[in-house]
């Protein structure tokens, strides 16, 4: 089993527990916003990610940093959950747990996540049109687009919804032609 699968297996019960707590306390939307904020902070700060994952740092130090960083910005239930992760030495997996939580929360809300990689930024009209097409394609009530610009696609875009990938990029087309011609393309 790959290390990624192990992380997912460990993250799942924590994500489920947080979702159950949020549903019980009727704060699912607030906790989801908190988790998204935390993910954004982690994405912007490699130092924080490394600090939280460092087994040599004390539990108290990690709790102090979490409280100083997000303590006044998040719901008390979310903060308590983070403290439990620190106590159980799982705070280093926070990013994976957060991703799993959001995936479960979005499933509960019938929200589909679509990861879009484009060669250039999309206009608001293009985003709206793409959202509507994906709603029809997936029969979802709501679609959330996570858009990233990757100039190396040359042109076009890729869409990933769950395990399904739609590649309309020029890079993808070149790879497909190269495979038909038995040529290696990087």
From Swiss-Prot:
The subcellular localization recorded is: Plastid, Chloroplast thylakoid membrane
Name the keywords, alphabetized.
ATP synthesis, CF(1), Chloroplast, Hydrogen ion transport, Ion transport, Membrane, Plastid, Thylakoid, Transport
**What PROSITE patterns would the database entry show?**
ATPASE_DELTA (PS00389)
Which Gene Ontology cellular-component terms appear in the entry?
chloroplast thylakoid membrane; proton-transporting ATP synthase complex
Q: Which GO terms describe its molecular function?
A: proton-transporting ATP synthase activity, rotational mechanism
Note the topology in the membrane: Peripheral membrane protein
Q: Does the keyword Isomerase apply?
A: no
Tell me if Heme is a UniProt keyword of this record.
Answer: no
Q: Which domain of life is it from?
A: Eukaryota
A Pfam family of this chain:
OSCP
The chain's disulfide connectivity reads: none
Q: What is its main location?
A: plastid
Description of how the protein assembles with itself and partners: F-type ATPases have 2 components, F(1) - the catalytic core - and F(0) - the membrane proton channel. F(1) has five subunits: alpha(3), beta(3), gamma(1), delta(1), epsilon(1). CF(0) has four main subunits: a(1), b(1), b'(1) and c(10-14). The alpha and beta chains form an alternating ring which encloses part of the gamma chain. F(1) is attached to F(0) by a central stalk formed by the gamma and epsilon chains, while a peripheral stalk is formed by the delta, b and b' chains.
> What function does the entry list?
F(1)F(0) ATP synthase produces ATP from ADP in the presence of a proton or sodium gradient. F-type ATPases consist of two structural domains, F(1) containing the extramembraneous catalytic core and F(0) containing the membrane proton channel, linked together by a central stalk and a peripheral stalk. During catalysis, ATP synthesis in the catalytic domain of F(1) is coupled via a rotary mechanism of the central stalk subunits to proton translocation. This protein is part of the stalk that links CF(0) to CF(1). It either transmits conformational changes from CF(0) to CF(1) or is implicated in proton conduction.
Family, as annotated: Belongs to the ATPase delta chain family.
Protein name in the entry: ATP synthase subunit delta, chloroplastic
Q: Which organism is it from?
A: Pyropia yezoensis
Q: Which gene encodes it?
A: atpD
């Amino acid at each position: 089993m790959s290390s990624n699968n192990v992380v997912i297996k460990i993250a799942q019960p924590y994500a489920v527990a947080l979702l159950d707590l949020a549903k019980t306390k009727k704060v699912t939307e607030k906790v989801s916003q908190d988790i998204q904020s935390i993910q954004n902070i982690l994405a912007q700060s490699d130092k924080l990610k490394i600090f939280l994952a460092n087994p040599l740092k004390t539990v108290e130090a990690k709790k102090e940093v979490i409280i100083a960083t997000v303590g006044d910005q998040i719901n008390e239930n979310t903060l308590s959950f983070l403290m439990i992760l620190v106590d159980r030495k799982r705070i280093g997996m926070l990013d994976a747990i957060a991703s799993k939580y959001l995936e479960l929360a979005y499933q509960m809300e019938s929200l589909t996540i679509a990861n879009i990689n484009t060669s250039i930024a999309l206009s608001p009209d293009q985003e709206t049109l793409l959202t509507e097409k994906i709603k029809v394609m997936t029969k979802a009530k709501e679609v959330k687009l996570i858009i990233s610009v990757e100039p190396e696609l040359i042109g076009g875009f890729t869409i990933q919804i769950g395990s399904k990938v739609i590649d309309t990029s020029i890079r993808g087309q070149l790879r497909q032609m190269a495979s038909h011609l038995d040529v290696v393309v990087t």
